[in-house]
């Protein structure tokens, strides 16, 4: 992505502790790629540095990432994305954390303890501000997860966020390339049909209850083929193949798909 000129790398799979080094390597490859391009294009590509933005869910993870980037690479983030417990898909929270926040139920509109995670957002912003001061630059903090309407956006701004990231609300739009059956699942879903489920990746995830999840409730779904997509994956023990489930979603085969979505779908 960096080699071909990506503007920003947003990284959320675990702790991206070596991301600055990967950017450096990517920049070198980009310069080599554009060496024979017209001088004007080459200069522009050579000078532009891809921005990096880690996704975090706690002040602790933000502190670890930014401290190690500072110590090991003498650099910091260009932006930080906070993914909250109401987000869709894989979540950066343990099941215990979700339970403590009241975010593991099918009625999160009644059980979610927003004020607890609001404090976490404020703490993350404080961590980021330390590196803003050290590097003398603005590091925007973006809040994601459960952003549904104007009130949610305004609330994020009041907490000190510079912006919000919205995913679920745009899935059903004409511009989204998801298959129609996937969009209809979002439109028809009721709050009590959105639930936390298990993932072979070792993280809890939020998805729409469907035939696939009901089969999973009865036991593991046999894996037909291994794609080597996860470094630590034993096809005999995992509950299902995450790749097959997501491919089915992309194809619109909703009865055999993992339909990830946010709490406010």
Give the ranges of each region predicted by the language model.
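Gly/Ser/Thr-rich loops at beta-strand to alpha-helix junctions
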Residues: 15-16, 147-149
């Amino acid at each position: 992505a960096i080699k071909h000129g990506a503007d920003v790398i947003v990284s959320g799979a675990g702790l991206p502790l070596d991301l600055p080094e990967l950017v450096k390597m990517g920049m070198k490859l980009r310069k080599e790629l554009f060496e024979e391009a017209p001088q004007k294009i080459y200069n522009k590509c050579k000078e532009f540095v891809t921005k990096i933005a880690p996704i975090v869910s706690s002040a602790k993870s933000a502190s670890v990432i930014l401290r190690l980037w500072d110590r090991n690479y003498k650099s910091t983030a260009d932006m930080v994305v906070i993914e909250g417990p109401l987000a869709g898909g894989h979540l950066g929270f343990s099941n215990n954390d979700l339970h403590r926040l009241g975010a593991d139920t099918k009625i999160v509109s009644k059980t979610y303890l927003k004020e607890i995670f609001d404090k976490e957002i404020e703490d993350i912003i404080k961590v980021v501000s330390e590196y803003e001061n050290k590097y003398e630059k603005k590091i925007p903090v973006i809040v994601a997860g459960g952003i549904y309407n104007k009130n949610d956006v305004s609330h994020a701004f009041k907490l000190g966020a510079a912006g919000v990231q919205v995913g679920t609300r745009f899935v059903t739009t004409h511009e989204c390339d998801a298959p129609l059956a996937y969009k209809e699942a979002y439109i028809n879903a009721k709050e009590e049909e959105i639930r936390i489920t298990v993932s072979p990746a070792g993280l809890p995830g939020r998805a729409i209850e469907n035939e696939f999840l009901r089969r999973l409730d009865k036991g593991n779904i046999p894996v037909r083929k291994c794609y080597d997509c996860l470094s630590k994956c034993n096809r005999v023990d995992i509950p299902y193949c995450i790749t097959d489930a997501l491919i089915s979603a992309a194809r619109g085969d909703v009865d055999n798909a993992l339909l990830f979505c946010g709490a406010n779908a």
